[in-house]
Amino acid sequence: YYFNFSFKEKNKKVKAEKKQVQSETTIFALPELHFQYDRKANWLQFKSFFFVNFLSIIKSVTFKILFIFSAIILISNLFGGFEYFGLQSYPLTYKLIDLINNASGIFVVIILVFFSGELIWRDRDNKINEVVDATPHQSFISLSAKALSLVGITIILHVFFVFCGVIYQLLNGYTRIELDLYFLDFVYNNLMIYIIWSSVMIMIQVVLNNKYIGYFISIAVIFIWEIILAIFDVQSNMLEIGAGPFLQYSDMNGFGPGLHGAMWFNLYWILFSIICLLIAGALWNRGIISSLKDKFKIAKKQVSKGYKMLIASFVVAWILVAGFVYYNTQVLNTYRTSDEQEI
């Protein structure tokens, strides 16, 4: 006979032995956190915001399409050659600069208008605006990073166009490559305008708090406002956004005597663009506030005295530069419209 051997008595319930685990609690002191909101922290935040916004534009399908179209137009114009009155001309640098400006102008405007709204509304569209708004950072730093990321995109676009122009010059046997002229023309004629437009469009999107109305007003500021001034025969560079004396390069006298006046107009508009960003920083919607009236109420309470003094100092500087420019263009010199100059 076979039987199962067991040390337990039959018909006796076996209770599971519960092992008591002694939990030991370790007590330690939490580390102290020292929050630093200095210039270094502001710079690190600015770089972070800048690269996030910059890369979001670079990766955008819309930007890639606009980039390809602008490149196609430039390359097609280059292969058209430089023929004047039946004579073929060398691809001189200043001629290529005019070609690049004509090919890139409209596409740069589209990029600035479109992505100014995309950068402002990206966090809200992705439902993470309240998380980003709750982080300890200054609104001015965030908005200035958005504006300069737009400027960075225009620089990348222009560098590519210059590269195409230089390759075209070399392929046609022209070796007098004036890279300094490419750079100076971009700084004098284009870069300042892109900075001003980017800042103004960012402010428009912040103040209006509606992406598509902001698009319309941005286009109106660039194109319709100029038409309105022309209708009333007002031709002042102090009223047209980003305007200044026309600079035309020549091999004999460079950019000419108008360069000095153009720099003063650039300073006048750069100060205006900084004021726009400062105002946008004060009115930036951090939270659920939407109406412009509520924004002004909150701004009066939350904006620090130092920030208000900063705005006031830039306004005073802008007024002083405006007075100097007005005195030189309207008082010392006789103001004449284009029609009067033709007579």
Range-by-range predicted roles:
Residues Y1, F107-F114, N190-V200, L267-L283:
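Hydrophobic cores of alpha-helical transmembrane segments in multi-pass inner/ER membrane proteins
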Residues I311-V325:
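Hydrophobic membrane-insertion alpha-helices, especially the h-region
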Residues L99-R122, N126, L157:
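Long, hydrophobic alpha-helical segments
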Residues T26-F67, I288-I298:
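Aromatic- and glycine-rich beta-strand/loop motifs that create alpha-glucan
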Residues L78-F79, P91-F107, S144-N209:
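Secretory targeting signals
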Residues G117-I153:
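Helix-loop-helix units of permease transmembrane domains in multi-pass membrane transporters
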